[in-house]
Design a protein with these regions (language model features):
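Positively charged
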Residues: 180-186
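Conserved nucleotide-cofactor-binding alpha/beta core module
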Residues: 45-163
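Class I SAM-dependent transferase core
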Residues: 1-53, 61-65, 69, 82-92, ...
């Protein structure tokens, strides 16, 4: 069924739940625009038998969307208050196959691999560790580069190594700790 996006939005922002804007979540994090969420899901196309790792839970809305499509979702959120709120919203929507963990993906170790990885914050460059968590024939959606012109890509894990498929240009706030080091200027 269709998930009410407003159920994942702060009360005072509910009238903006479907507007084409990024909604603030606190900690400098935002809920991505609905159009970007749609393109992300379209490019990943999680299947009913697949496992998904989401990096950056935020509101929990994308985790819920992924959970409706896939077999199971593990979602990482570095901020404890966001993680707790997201888990509560997922429970309220009766979505039982999504687990939110409070962890920093840049240092966390899953001890397993996944069919699909969805990274909801941008990175300066693609972390090798994320790619290593993909199952053979798995795929990862990630946005990388320098704001305001970043590239959304799918990283495909194949027997012959990894292939990067460019999807579209976009701009997205960085994953906590994953912004590029500022260029040194005099």
């Amino acid at each position: 069924g269709n998930l009410p996006r407003e159920a994942f939005v702060a009360d005072d922002l509910r009238n903006l739940a479907y507007a084409d804007v990024e909604l603030p979540l606190g900690h400098g994090q935002v809920m991505m625009k609905p159009v970007l969420e749609g393109r992300l899901l379209q490019s990943l196309q999680p299947q009913a038998h697949e496992s998904v790792l989401e990096i950056g839970t935020g509101s929990g809305y994308m985790a819920a969307c992924l959970g409706q499509l896939a077999r199971e979702v593990i979602s990482l959120e570095v901020h404890a208050d966001l993680a707790e709120a997201a888990q509560a919203r997922l429970a309220a929507q009766d979505i039982g196959n999504v687990k939110v963990r409070c962890a920093d993906a840049l240092s966390w170790n899953p001890g397993r691999s996944f069919d699909v990885i969805c990274v909801t914050g941008a990175v300066g460059s693609i972390p090798a560790r994320f790619v290593e968590w993909l199952n053979p024939n798995g795929r990862m959606f990630i946005v990388h580069g320098q704001s305001p012109v970043m590239e959304a890509v799918l990283v495909h894990s194949t027997v012959n190594g990894n292939r990067i498929e460019t999807l579209f240009e976009t701009d997205l706030s960085y994953l906590a700790g994953a912004a590029p080091a500022p260029a040194f200027t005099l």
